[in-house]
């Protein structure tokens, strides 16, 4: 007991603990910034097309209806991406899923910038939209699983901040590109491409950076425990959480046992409950009074 107290009061031990805390904090912030870059691309991808809407219609000579569908096509991909992100991350991991999202952001940006027809300009934003849907689900889930409880709220809000910054910088870059044209017209050419195409091309840099940074972050401990990779999970926990790794792993295992995997069909199932039946009958009896003359 006395030995333990001496170790706690030892200045060298306290200094070592402080260094470990600072090192752990820096590592967590690096992880959080890397993951939140997906939120930045979320905002950037959804906003960057705003500066090119009119010019796309002029370049491809399409109707307003077709142009509107081209602009909204990314939302279709976003819905599908958000719907499938959980399924994908449970199979290939959170980090690998974010890498897939980064590559989709990259492909969507290049494809949209070089699209030769309005049809391809509808298809490629769907690819980018898939990445938006992935990012909207994966980054918050990953940050929640890998960050300490004391920082979870702060790091979670980082995703929202990144989205807003992405929207702002996308619109700012659209404006800057227009200023670079001789007549301040987005249809004008800058180098080999029309100005509006550079607006899409500008997303390549943050998308490539996202792909690089994601490869350097650890996998979620929850996913590793779920796949039976407890030693790898323990190594990640020791780097990120100021808790005993074995206790954290035990909690994760317990939560995995008690977790119910929902199915799409459950949205349409009506659970049977006697109390609900009683309320239904009572409400049905009151219905004539409610629906009578007012």
Residue ranges and their predicted role:
Residues 2-294:
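Transmembrane-helix signature of 12-pass secondary carriers
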């Amino acid at each position: 007991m006395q030995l333990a107290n001496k170790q706690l009061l030892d200045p060298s031990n306290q200094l070592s603990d402080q260094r470990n805390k600072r090192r752990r904090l820096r590592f967590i912030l690096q992880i959080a910034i890397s993951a939140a870059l997906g939120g930045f691309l979320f905002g950037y991808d959804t906003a960057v097309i705003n500066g090119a809407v009119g010019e796309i219609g002029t370049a491809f000579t399409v109707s307003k209806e077709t142009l509107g569908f081209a602009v909204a096509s990314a939302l279709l991909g976003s819905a599908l991406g958000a719907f499938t992100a959980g399924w994908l991350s449970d199979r290939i991991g959170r980090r690998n899923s974010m890498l897939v999202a980064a590559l989709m952001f990259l492909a969507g940006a290049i494809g949209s910038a070089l699209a030769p027809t309005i049809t391809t300009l509808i298809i490629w934003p769907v690819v980018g939209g898939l990445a938006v849907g992935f990012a909207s689900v994966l980054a918050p889930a990953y940050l929640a699983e890998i960050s300490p409880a004391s920082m979870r709220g702060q790091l979670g809000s980082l995703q929202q901040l990144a989205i807003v910054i992405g929207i702002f910088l996308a619109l700012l870059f659209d404006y800057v590109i227009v200023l670079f044209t001789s007549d301040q017209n987005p249809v004008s050419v800058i180098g080999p491409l029309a100005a509006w195409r550079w607006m899409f091309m500008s997303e390549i840099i943050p998308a490539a950076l996202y792909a690089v940074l994601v490869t350097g972050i650890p996998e979620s401990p929850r996913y590793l425990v779920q796949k039976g990779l407890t030693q790898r999970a323990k190594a990640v926990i020791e780097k990120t959480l100021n808790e005993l790794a074995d206790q954290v792993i035990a909690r994760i295992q317990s939560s995995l046992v008690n977790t119910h995997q929902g199915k799409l069909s459950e949205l349409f199932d009506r659970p049977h409950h006697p109390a609900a039946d009683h309320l239904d009958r009572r409400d049905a009896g009151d219905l004539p009074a409610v629906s009578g003359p007012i």
